[in-house]
From Swiss-Prot:
<keyword id="KW-0963">Cytoplasm</keyword>
<keyword id="KW-0067">ATP-binding</keyword>
<keyword id="KW-0547">Nucleotide-binding</keyword>
<dbReference type="GO" id="GO:0000105">
    <property type="term" value="P:L-histidine biosynthetic process"/>
</dbReference>
<keyword id="KW-0378">Hydrolase</keyword>
<dbReference type="GO" id="GO:0004636">
    <property type="term" value="F:phosphoribosyl-ATP diphosphatase activity"/>
</dbReference>
<keyword id="KW-0028">Amino-acid biosynthesis</keyword>
<dbReference type="Pfam" id="PF01503">
    <property type="entry name" value="PRA-PH"/>
</dbReference>
<dbReference type="GO" id="GO:0005737">
    <property type="term" value="C:cytoplasm"/>
</dbReference>
<dbReference type="InterPro" id="IPR021130">
    <property type="entry name" value="PRib-ATP_PPHydrolase-like"/>
</dbReference>
<comment type="pathway">
    <text>Amino-acid biosynthesis; L-histidine biosynthesis; L-histidine from 5-phospho-alpha-D-ribose 1-diphosphate: step 2/9.</text>
</comment>
<comment type="similarity">
    <text>Belongs to the PRA-PH family.</text>
</comment>
<dbReference type="GO" id="GO:0005524">
    <property type="term" value="F:ATP binding"/>
</dbReference>
<keyword id="KW-0368">Histidine biosynthesis</keyword>
<dbReference type="InterPro" id="IPR008179">
    <property type="entry name" value="HisE"/>
</dbReference>
<protein>
    <recommendedName>
        <fullName>Phosphoribosyl-ATP pyrophosphatase</fullName>
        <ecNumber>3.6.1.31</ecNumber>
    </recommendedName>
</protein>
């Protein structure tokens, strides 16, 4: 099984890309308002898209697809959290609260 710490590492990279806005960064582009739509809309649309792809993979019994699309969905949720200034630790705290 992989190391769950990778979520923290990915979250930090996302935060850095939002703050530093390096040219050519997918995260920087996704989290920037443009002429056609606000960043929050772009992020939420990606989450909807990835959710749908995950559902279809699950419905089709595509185990590899479920893993792939779950990763895409989790990544975009991490982008949303970072964009909104929500620390990933807040989500971990909520999981712990619900576990009790």
């Amino acid at each position: 099984m992989g190391d769950p710490e990778v979520l923290l590492e990915v979250y930090e990279v996302i935060r850095n890309r939002i703050e530093e806005r390096p040219e050519g960064s997918y995260v920087a582009e996704l989290t920037e308002d443009d002429d056609t739509k606000p960043a929050i809309n772009k992020i939420c649309e990606k989450i909807i898209e990835e959710s749908g792809e995950l559902i279809l993979a699950a419905k089709d019994g595509d185990r590899e697809g479920v893993v792939y699309e779950s990763t895409d969905l989790i990544f975009h949720v991490l982008v949303l959290l970072a964009y909104l200034g929500i620390e990933i630790g807040e989500v971990f705290d909520e999981f712990e609260r619900r576990r009790k």
